[in-house]
Amino acid sequence: MMLNGERIISKPLRWAMVGGGRLSQVGYKHRIGALRDNTAFQLTAGAFDIDAERGKDFGVNLGVDAERCYPNYQTMFAEEAKRQDGIEVVSIATPNGTHYEICKAALEAGVHVICEKPLFFTSAEGQEIKALAEKKGKIVGVTYGFSGNQMLLQMRAMIEQGMIGDIRVVDLQYTHGFCATDEGEKISAAQKWRVDPAIAGPSFVLGDLSTHTYYMSQLIMPKMKIKELLCDRQSFVGSRAPLEDNAHVLMHYENGAVGTMWTSSINAGCMDGHRIRIVGSKASIEWWDSKPNELTYEVQGEPGQTLVRGMPYLDDVCNADERLGALHSEGLSEAWANIYLKFAIAIDAKNREDEEILNNLVYPDIDAGIEGIRWIENCVRSANQGSVWVEFK
């Protein structure tokens, strides 16, 4: 059965945003994701911009009541808590260094949270927020937007069904060339903060890019755990040091498999080098973000196959997220809508204390966010010690 916008939860969740304003690169992706299924979320408030007047003007143009366009998140949480129809969930679409304080304030105000990645600077902060969320009975979701591509669930099903055999090699890549020079930092505030350690944290592309692909690999292969890794990172544009614009990571998994991750913003000429290839003892499967509706399945000694999204031969877990049918292409907008719909289902289940749904729903939750921080921490630790093998802690 295809998703068609019908009600899946009892009523739309009253939703707000912190950040994601007129000048934001990512804010529109959040709104596309949340509002694609208009029975799941309703945008009712926001602190959209560090410039309060610009944020208010933007919010009004989105259809938000002027009185609920707030100058900052502190005021929003305080004022919304006084209302009978106050917000129930907030999305945090701000620079990395602000995530922790906003997330903590939201939970203390009794509001569910959906947050940009990387979640926080340290895994210790992640554990603290996880404990607070559990105490308050709230959900924290993380917007690993690419993970909403349903062909990734097809990969997961094929691996679980033994269709590629034992996993031997994991080949991960997320690269582009848009930061091959420092011109972006000169004209874009969003790019400038990404290479500022005080705002971005301990990494650039490891946090900004590779966390997406790392989570996707976990989604596809939930039983695969990294035993140790080695990270070599570079700042080819020197002004970005100590943050990296290129990194290679080697991985040893607990089952004996090996893996690689190449993440880069200086892959000159590359528009979208985002791919995952899993090599098994029987066959290999591969997915490219530039062709999100297709999955390559190659059995040793047989002609290669291209599996296409929306077709009845795919697993039910994949087709459960189908929206447009195989005749039409789906892409990033649908992927974001898929994860936002799962956030809504998780929040609704949490509100109703429906543990069965929560235990069976696959979505990027706070544990996924903490695991992404651990990935960054271990990569940076290896690189800073001279690119040595380190235990994955």
From Swiss-Prot:
Pfam family, one: GFO_IDH_MocA
Coiled-coil segments on the chain, per record: none
Keyword Hydrolase in record: no
Enzyme Commission code: 1.-.-.-
Keywords associated with the record: Oxidoreductase
Broad EC category: oxidoreductase
GO MF term list: nucleotide binding; oxidoreductase activity
Similarity section: Belongs to the Gfo/Idh/MocA family.
Name the UniProt record assigns to this protein: Uncharacterized oxidoreductase YfiI
Gene giving rise to this polypeptide: yfiI
